[in-house]
Amino acid sequence: MQLCVALDLEKKEDNLSLLQELKGLDLWAKVGLRSFIRDGAVFLDEIRKIDGNFKIFLDLKLYDIPYTMANAALECAKLEVDMLTVHLSSAKSALTILMQRLNALKKRPLIMGVSALTSFSEEEFLSVYNAPLKTQAIKLSVMGKESGIDGVVCSVFESLAIKEALGKDFLTLTPGIRLNKNDKEDQERVANAKEAKQNLSDFIVVGRPIYQAKEPREVVLELLKDC
């Protein structure tokens, strides 16, 4: 299991300062919408300058009509990121075209499809998709695998079921990881790193428990022990 550190701080300088503290550790730097829109592609180069071994996870959750998505994913791949997210709800046709475009490259990022955001409660998900959360997450994951993507973004609570349905080689990335499960904030379906590993998660995403800590490096070292 691998650790992705979410770079969601208010200022670019704060994100870079955090990475300076974590230099030399085996982790992924997750760049989301806030940081990428504010700081641009140059931010990715600044991450690499701090530690060239950091892998970069560009979490943009692309969601649009097929060719627009595919073209956007191609531009992201040109930035030499190691992982990229797309929405599974964009449908099989969009994902298939996207993967055809990326598979023509010599090197491409891992493509992870978002099934159900961890901010969804069961009730909220049902009101939007008119289906039980876990059932729909598995259904979307099956479609994603048929489209050729590498894995899905899901909560810890769907990870094992997805692995059982689609095999251990189909990757699961689980956000909503907390040191204390009572600290939900804007997440609904949270778990800790040990539970993520028990449920066969390949990647975990941790943000606030790291960057709000007095000693972020110590928190990361503890998390890496559980990975």
From Swiss-Prot:
<dbReference type="InterPro" id="IPR013785">
    <property type="entry name" value="Aldolase_TIM"/>
</dbReference>
<dbReference type="GO" id="GO:0006207">
    <property type="term" value="P:'de novo' pyrimidine nucleobase biosynthetic process"/>
</dbReference>
<dbReference type="InterPro" id="IPR014732">
    <property type="entry name" value="OMPdecase"/>
</dbReference>
<keyword id="KW-0210">Decarboxylase</keyword>
<feature type="binding site">
    <location>
        <position position="208"/>
    </location>
    <ligand>
        <name>substrate</name>
    </ligand>
</feature>
<feature type="binding site">
    <location>
        <position position="30"/>
    </location>
    <ligand>
        <name>substrate</name>
    </ligand>
</feature>
<dbReference type="InterPro" id="IPR047596">
    <property type="entry name" value="OMPdecase_bac"/>
</dbReference>
<dbReference type="InterPro" id="IPR018089">
    <property type="entry name" value="OMPdecase_AS"/>
</dbReference>
<feature type="binding site">
    <location>
        <position position="187"/>
    </location>
    <ligand>
        <name>substrate</name>
    </ligand>
</feature>
<comment type="subunit">
    <text>Homodimer.</text>
</comment>
<dbReference type="InterPro" id="IPR001754">
    <property type="entry name" value="OMPdeCOase_dom"/>
</dbReference>
<comment type="function">
    <text>Catalyzes the decarboxylation of orotidine 5'-monophosphate (OMP) to uridine 5'-monophosphate (UMP).</text>
</comment>
<comment type="similarity">
    <text>Belongs to the OMP decarboxylase family. Type 1 subfamily.</text>
</comment>
<comment type="pathway">
    <text>Pyrimidine metabolism; UMP biosynthesis via de novo pathway; UMP from orotate: step 2/2.</text>
</comment>
<dbReference type="GO" id="GO:0044205">
    <property type="term" value="P:'de novo' UMP biosynthetic process"/>
</dbReference>
<keyword id="KW-0456">Lyase</keyword>
<protein>
    <recommendedName>
        <fullName>Orotidine 5'-phosphate decarboxylase</fullName>
        <ecNumber>4.1.1.23</ecNumber>
    </recommendedName>
</protein>
<feature type="binding site">
    <location>
        <position position="178"/>
    </location>
    <ligand>
        <name>substrate</name>
    </ligand>
</feature>
<dbReference type="GO" id="GO:0004590">
    <property type="term" value="F:orotidine-5'-phosphate decarboxylase activity"/>
</dbReference>
<feature type="binding site">
    <location>
        <begin position="59"/>
        <end position="68"/>
    </location>
    <ligand>
        <name>substrate</name>
    </ligand>
</feature>
<feature type="binding site">
    <location>
        <position position="118"/>
    </location>
    <ligand>
        <name>substrate</name>
    </ligand>
</feature>
<feature type="binding site">
    <location>
        <position position="8"/>
    </location>
    <ligand>
        <name>substrate</name>
    </ligand>
</feature>
<feature type="binding site">
    <location>
        <position position="207"/>
    </location>
    <ligand>
        <name>substrate</name>
    </ligand>
</feature>
<dbReference type="Pfam" id="PF00215">
    <property type="entry name" value="OMPdecase"/>
</dbReference>
<dbReference type="InterPro" id="IPR011060">
    <property type="entry name" value="RibuloseP-bd_barrel"/>
</dbReference>
<dbReference type="GO" id="GO:0005829">
    <property type="term" value="C:cytosol"/>
</dbReference>
<keyword id="KW-0665">Pyrimidine biosynthesis</keyword>
<feature type="active site" description="Proton donor">
    <location>
        <position position="61"/>
    </location>
</feature>
